[in-house]
């Protein structure tokens, strides 16, 4: 009951992550909404252990293992409906376990984009190759990829690889990671190419192995959408190099980079088709100034949302 109430309250607040962290003899609960982490309450250790065991059981994790890290996911039923959860646990040096719960909301909705960004990007997607999307947690990256997929690839073979599947679609072949049976990003990408998809959507490039697999897929003639964690267009390019992709391979495969945030009730997108390393933040900052002038955001928020040269990672 405590666990269910915890999820219900988080959904109402549109929380992206719930943290259960050991502090002394008790546990502290935090919520993350966009980029802000907020302290919620302190709970007794036995209460939290019961909550963690509850979620681990539902996600098929080893309930008795408290030191080694474990990851899993589940669909969680509560009073108002169902939500997908992604779970990550790890024990500290004392053997006290922490849990982070990522809430994956049903994003199958038409996200509003400022300044005609959706149509503008759709016009730029013309050839095969790799298109990368980036932005903070909850900024609508997956929603943008799916909206572009429906707009540009109607009645085409679309295959997705995610961890877990965030937007369930009957007209797409959707695969979900399961490392226990060898269903890794690398293996599923190899498998997916045998299905000859018109569009391959890969949830996230997290490591060098996935980065290489994504590059290979895009160089074999497929159109590939994927996400990378970075704070700007230039940061996405730099991150791919950090993951071991050579500049030659990246330049051959890459067809565009989109960076986005949810600002003033809609998506603001910066899109580039080349010269990624030296991409100027001027157009992004001009969009922020327009939102400020129209009264959609405050002066303080405008300063926070602007991209300063050098903030790329």
Model-derived segments and spans:
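Short, flexible helix-loop junctions that flank or precede catalytic/ligand sites
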Residues: 1-313
């Amino acid at each position: 009951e405590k666990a269910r109430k915890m999820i219900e309250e988080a959904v109402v607040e549109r929380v992206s992550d719930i943290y259960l962290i050991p502090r002394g003899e008790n546990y502290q609960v935090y919520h993350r909404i966009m980029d802000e982490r907020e302290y919620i309450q302190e709970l007794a250790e036995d209460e939290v252990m019961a909550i963690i065991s509850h979620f681990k059981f539902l996600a098929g994790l080893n309930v008795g293992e408290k030191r080694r890290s474990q990851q899993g996911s589940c669909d969680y039923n509560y009073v108002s409906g169902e939500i997908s959860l992604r779970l990550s646990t790890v024990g500290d040096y004392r053997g006290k376990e922490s849990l982070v719960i990522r809430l994956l909301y049903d994003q199958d909705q038409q996200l509003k984009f400022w300044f005609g960004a959706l149509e503008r990007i759709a016009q730029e997607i013309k050839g095969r190759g790799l298109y990368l999307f980036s932005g903070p947690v909850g900024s609508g990256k997956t929603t943008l990829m799916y909206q572009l997929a429906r707009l540009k690839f109607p009645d085409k073979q679309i295959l997705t690889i995610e961890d877990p599947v965030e937007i369930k679609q009957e007209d797409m072949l959707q695969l979900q990671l399961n490392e226990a049976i060898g269903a890794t990003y690398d293996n599923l990408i190899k498998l997916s190419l045998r299905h000859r998809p018109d569009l391959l959507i890969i949830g996230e490039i997290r490591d060098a192995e996935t980065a290489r697999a994504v590059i290979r897929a895009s160089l074999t003639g497929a159109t590939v959408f994927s996400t990378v964690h970075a704070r700007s267009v230039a940061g996405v390019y730099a991150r791919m190099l950090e993951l071991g992709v050579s500049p030659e391979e990246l330049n051959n495969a890459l067809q565009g980079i989109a960076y986005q945030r949810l600002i003033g009730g809609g998506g603001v997108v910066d899109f580039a088709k080349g010269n990624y390393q030296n991409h100027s933040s001027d157009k992004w900052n001009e969009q922020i100034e327009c939102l400020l002038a129209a009264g959609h955001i405050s002066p303080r928020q405008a300063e926070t949302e602007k991209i300063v040269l050098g903030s790329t990672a």
